[in-house]
Curated annotation (Swiss-Prot):
Gene Ontology CC terms, in alphabetical order: cytosol
Species name: Lactiplantibacillus plantarum (strain ATCC BAA-793 / NCIMB 8826 / WCFS1) (Lactobacillus plantarum)
Subunit composition and interactions: Homodimer.
Ranges for domain Glutamine amidotransferase type-2: 2-220
Name of the molecule in the record: Glutamine--fructose-6-phosphate aminotransferase [isomerizing]
NCBIfam families named among the record's database cross-references: glmS, PRK00331.1
Reaction it catalyzes: D-fructose 6-phosphate + L-glutamine = D-glucosamine 6-phosphate + L-glutamate
Functional description taken from the UniProt entry: Catalyzes the first step in hexosamine metabolism, converting fructose-6P into glucosamine-6P using glutamine as a nitrogen source.
Alphabetic keyword roster: Aminotransferase, Cytoplasm, Glutamine amidotransferase, Repeat, Transferase
HAMAP family according to UniProt: GlmS
GO biological process: carbohydrate metabolic process; fructose 6-phosphate metabolic process; protein N-linked glycosylation; UDP-N-acetylglucosamine metabolic process
């Protein structure tokens, strides 16, 4: 959600901070700010409501420094405003703080320690910077000791903190709990960021931080300590991503670029996880743990949850293992009765989803095995799960996920094939996943090459509607949920996906003249039923659009999909939905990549 950047030891601190914040725009934000110090007695605080471009204009040419911190804020406490933007400042102007997370007990802390302080913002963050100042000025503690004491008062709150002391201007104080932060290691300088993408043009070597750790960062020194104040030794990891991969190139929006990248993502997964004979390359220990499970539990949120619905069908049909799919925010506080030998699979693009992590922590406490499937190496959920599989999809910047969704499904297909073969399931042995993913990649390419067709459909059916419905059965229902979410996210159309058999149980009352109803038909055993449902809504004036596999197509169908194995049709049927959402948003003049009120990485509950 919020983005954090910091740098010490670079004369170009201002441009590094602003460029870093721009690379974090995809996380979602409503205001931004920076604080820089030149270590010669000059410092600058600039905050702005709105976009980074607005902040950059406000900064201008006069602001300079060699150490600084920056932040993009996604409002949780207090409305979007300059006063509530970060950095937040102590009453005497000595301390500056940026923060991602939620301080659960900030009202109690205000009443207990700061009843005499006049606050300038509505944020929980200001409470923290005022506490640090109070412990330094009133109790004579050092900045580090005051910071540590403050952290000890926060209970189970989530936070990623980056603090500066005006009287020690080349030092950054860093702490985290349940919120991602990394230290980027340079030569004669160091950086801090909530996502390595922000600083890949400065360094590709990063130190991960664990919950409860505090770090003191200087230009030529990084000191990590644990909650007890004991030193922690840790080697940096290398991020093998070219910064250019995170650029739009010639595309107008990241989302379109990422839709177009999906065929190559399918091919990449085949290269990484399948040998020349088409056999899965999966860790033996992971397969052993999966074989020992009597039930799989897929836990995810948003688009990843929809990918999990498809994954469950793959595990059950190929490996004959019962599989449940749960929304992570519900599972975290309403855990169902579990089987005797559960195995948990966490689907998360970022590897930082707060709700999913809460479930994983509970799973670890119960000593159950787990797997994280994520696009981000060294992310929190990848570190804390028993096993990790990477999506290898490349950076996904647009808030609305596309290629990570299809990568999650494809990798679950490979894993289900591997497990099925390991437990001697004939269906898995017969399933040629390598050949099918090649067909999928080619099919995706044929679809993304027909952009003009999808723009025409979007303009005709979706551009001027206040609501839309996506229907299907089985796997098509799962895709209906995802494609409706895409339209909802980026074009602000009230779109709903539901099982087509439920039409007569209430939803058909909402159908009127020209209401768009998109029917997805890829499953032979339910094709006739879904067509019947579409005829029912058409008779009531609905404007119907059909997305149909070639082998099931009839005259008058709108979009014809290449034929692939029925278990993988979701990988193709979702692409038209992605493009319809994109072109609806584009022709409404909206910001496709950064829809209102949304964040790419949801790091608070």
């Amino acid at each position: 959600m919020c983005g954090i950047v910091g740098v010490t030891g670079k004369d170009s601190a201002v441009s590094i901070l602003l460029n870093g914040l721009e690379k974090l725009e995809y996380r979602g934000y409503d205001s931004a700010g920076i604080y820089v110090n030149d270590q010669d007695g000059h410092d600058y605080l600039v905050k702005e409501k709105g976009r980074i471009d607005d902040l950059r204009k406000e900064v201008g040419e006069a602001v300079h420094g060699s150490t600084g911190i920056g932040h993009t804020r996604w409002a949780t406490h207090g409305e979007p405003s300059v006063a509530n933007a970060h950095p937040q400042v102590s009453a005497d102007g000595r301390f500056y703080l940026v923060h991602n997370g939620v301080i659960e007990n900030f009202e109690d802390l205000k009443q207990t320690y700061l009843s005499d302080v006049t606050f300038k913002s509505q944020t929980d963050t200001e409470v923290i910077v005022q506490l640090v100042d109070r412990f330094v000025t009133k109790e004579g503690l050092s900045t580090l000791a005051a910071f540590r004491k403050t952290l000890g008062l926060l209970g189970h709150s989530s936070y990623g903190f980056l603090l500066m002391d005006k009287e020690d201007p080349d030092t950054l104080y860093v702490a985290k709990n349940k919120s991602p932060l990394l230290i980027g290691v340079g030569e004669g300088f160091n950086v801090v960021c909530s996502d390595s993408l922000a600083m890949l043009d400065q360094t590709k070597d990063f130190l991960e931080l664990h919950d409860g750790e505090i770090v003191v960062v200087k230009p030529d020194e990084i000191k990590i300590t644990n909650q007890a104040g004991e030193p922690v030794e840790r080697k940096p990891f290398h991020v093998d991503i070219d910064a250019a991969q995170a650029d739009k190139g010639t595309y107008p929006f990241y989302m379109l670029k990422e839709i177009d990248e999906q065929p190559n993502v399918m091919r990449k997964l085949s290269q990484v996880y399948l040998n020349d004979a088409g056999d899965p390359i999966i860790n033996d220990d992971l397969l052993t743990a999966l074989k020992a499970a009597d039930r799989l539990y897929i836990v995810a949120a948003g688009t990843s949850y929809h990918a999990g619905l498809v994954g469950a069908k793959l595990f059950e049909s190929l490996a004959n293992v019962p599989t449940e799919v749960h929304v992570s925010s519900e599972f975290a506080y309403n855990q169902p009765l579990l089987s005797a030998h559960p195995f948990f699979i966490f689907l998360t693009q970022s590897g930082e989803t707060a709700d999913s992590r809460e479930v994983l922590l509970n799973v670890n406490d119960q000593h159950f095995p787990s797997l994280t499937i994520t696009n981000v190496p060294n992310s929190t959920l990848s570190r804390e799960a028993t096993y990790t599989l990477l999506l290898h999809a490349g950076p996904e910047i647009a808030v609305a996920s596309t290629k990570a969704y299809t990568a999650q499904i494809a990798l679950q297909a490979i894993l289900a094939k591997a497990l099925g073969v390991a437990v001697d399931q004939p269906a898995a042995t017969a399933f040629d996943v390598k050949q099918q993913l090649a067909l999928v990649a080619n099919g995706m390419q044929s679809l993304v090459d027909e952009k003009a067709t999808f723009e025409k459909i979007a303009k005709s059916a979706l551009l001027n509607t206040p609501n839309a419905f996506y229907i299907g059965r089985g796997l098509d229902y799962a895709v209906s949920l995802e494609t409706a979410l895409k339209l909802k996210e980026i074009s602000y159309v009230q779109a709903e996906g539901f099982a087509s058999g439920e039409l007569k149980h209430g939803t058909i009352a909402l159908i009127e003249k020209d209401t768009p109803v998109i029917g997805i038909i890829t499953q032979k055993n339910t094709a006739g039923l879904t067509r019947s449902n579409l005829q029912e809504v058409a008779a009531r004036g609905a404007k119907t659009v059909t997305i149909v596999t070639d082998s099931l197509a009839k005259d008058g169908d709108t979009v014809i999909l290449p034929t692939v194995d029925e278990r993988l049709t979701a990988l193709l049927s979702v692409v038209p939905g992605q493009l319809l959402a994109y072109y609806t948003s584009l022709n409404k003049g909206l910001d496709v990549d950064k829809p209102r009120n949304l964040a790419k990485s949801v790091t608070v509950e």
